[in-house]
Amino acid sequence: MVRLSAFADEVSVVFDEQLKYLNEAGIKWMEIRFVDGKNITALSDEEVMEVKAKLRKASIGVSAIASPIGKYAIDAPFEDHMNLFRRTIRTAQMLDAGMIRIFSFYGSDDTDIENCQEEVIRRLQAFSEEVKGTGICLVHENE
């Protein structure tokens, strides 16, 4: 089954307007990224539950969490990033999202990403291990 899904935050920063647009366009799924200007990964559990209620009322499902995971320099501290990833998994579970979009890091002024293949793979494997057993699929977007 094909699911047509959209980044509704490209239509409006206001979440209610995003849902209205999706319904008017006949799109029943969204890749959720920003809610009222705030990244979905930064929302509290209470805020996520408010989002879920609005989604349910609008009959819109979440196909994926469009996260910023991996969209950081490879030399940034990994533990903070892993904590954000764990939060993203929780958010995906709360919203019944089957996928989390991730990236595969980039270099910095001091670090050429081409020389960091082993570290990139180590980090992606850590994400993969963390999501095991959750039913969530990680989907990679090239930067």
Locations of the language-model features?
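Boundary/entry segment of secreted carbohydrate-active catalytic domains
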Residues: 1-15
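Structural preference for beta-strand elements that scaffold enzyme active sites
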Residues: 3-5, 29-31, 59-66, 97-101, ...
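Active-site beta-loop-alpha junctions enriched in small/polar residues
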Residues: 7-11, 33-35, 65-70, 105-107, ...
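A generic secondary-structure micro-motif detector
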Residues: 8, 40-41, 78, 117
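Catalytic domains of carbohydrate-active enzymes, especially glycoside hydrolases
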Residues: 15-35, 95-96
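Active-site acidic/histidine proton-transfer and metal-coordination neighborhood
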Residues: 17-20, 54-57, 73-143
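Glycine-rich, proline-tolerant flexible connector loops at the mouths of alpha/beta enzymes
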Residues: 31-56, 104-111
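Short active-site-adjacent helix-start/loop capping segments
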Residues: 38-41, 71-75
